């Protein structure tokens, strides 16, 4: 029987700061911490791998002074950017006492994925890998033993507020099955159109345990309500109460 670690990974609610007021990012991370989130995700986009430009390591580093919650950085950047700036991203993502922050490299952007993931670990980060909706699960099979998290994109990255792609559930369950078979302690994250409804519910039932929400959390009157609602629906799904796809 597989260890509990492989099958019942803790549920984590992780806001993406894309919909935040970027001119008040320090206050935003402080508010998110008070809302009870598990981590905060920074979507790094270089205008090359995706058609948008967002945050560099300096902004992430500046936010560290305003809260103690752990960070994760998703590198939606070209291979050149990933390789030349990796050390800065890993440093900026570290916790308040230098704990390893989650640094997510995209499988599609990196020809030498093992090298990148190994280097993240070596630099004191928590190596993780992301894949776009069209990318098959097989693309990450050979790096599962090197990573702490696998991020399954449920939209094509580049912009916030896009509609969730429901056909990723098979990929999530195949991934969880493989992780259990190999008895690995790997978290599955989902990102894109995740809300406190059937989307988070079905992803959780399929085997995901980390849920990234941007507009799905910031749409609430308070961030705490958003965080609590997302967590409740995920925990309900884990207890067997899975919400159906709307007709």
Label the model's feature ranges.
Residues 11-17, 40-42, 63, 71-75, ...:
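Hydrophobic faces of well-ordered beta-strands that scaffold small-molecule active sites
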Residues 25, 32, 43, 89, ...:
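Conserved, mostly hydrophobic/aromatic
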Residues 29, 81-92, 135-146, 193-211:
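Catalytic cores of alpha/beta
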Residues 39-57, 155-163:
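Glycine-rich, proline-tolerant flexible connector loops at the mouths of alpha/beta enzymes
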Residues 52-120, 129:
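Glycine/small-residue-rich loop that forms an oxyanion/phosphate-binding "nest" at active or ligand-binding sites
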Residues 98-109, 151-162, 206-226:
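Glycine-rich phosphate-binding active-site loops on the catalytic face of alpha/beta enzymes
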Residues 130-170, 174:
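Histidine/lysine/aspartate-rich catalytic loop segments that bind and position anionic ligands
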Residues 219-247:
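C-terminal helical cap(s) of enzyme catalytic domains, especially alpha/beta-barrels
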């Amino acid at each position: 029987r597989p260890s509990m670690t492989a099958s019942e990974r803790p549920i984590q609610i992780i806001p993406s700061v894309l919909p935040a007021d970027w001119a008040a990012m320090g206050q935003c991370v402080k508010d998110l911490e008070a809302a009870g989130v598990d981590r905060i995700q920074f979507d790094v986009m270089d205008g090359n791998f995706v058609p948008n430009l967002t945050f560099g390591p300096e902004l992430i580093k500046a936010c560290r002074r305003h809260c103690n919650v752990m960070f994760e950085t998703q590198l939606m950047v070209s291979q050149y950017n990933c390789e030349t700036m990796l050390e800065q991203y890993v440093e900026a993502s570290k916790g308040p006492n230098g704990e390893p922050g989650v640094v997510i490299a995209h499988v599609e952007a990196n020809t030498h994925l093992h090298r990148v993931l190994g280097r993240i670990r070596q630099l004191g980060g928590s190596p993780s890998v992301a894949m776009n909706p069209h990318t098959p699960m097989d693309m990450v099979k050979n790096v599962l033993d090197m990573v702490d998290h696998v991020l399954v994109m449920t939209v094509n990255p580049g912009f916030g507020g896009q509609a969730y792609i429901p056909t990723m559930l098979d990929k999530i369950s195949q991934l969880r099955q493989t992780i259990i078979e190999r008895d690995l302690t790997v978290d599955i994250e989902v990102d894109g159109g995740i809300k406190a409804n059937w989307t988070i519910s079905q992803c959780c039932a399929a085997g995901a345990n980390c849920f990234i929400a941007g507009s799905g959390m910031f749409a609430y009157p308070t961030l705490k309500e958003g965080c609590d609602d997302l967590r409740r629906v995920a925990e309900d799904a884990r207890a067997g109460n899975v919400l159906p796809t709307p007709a």
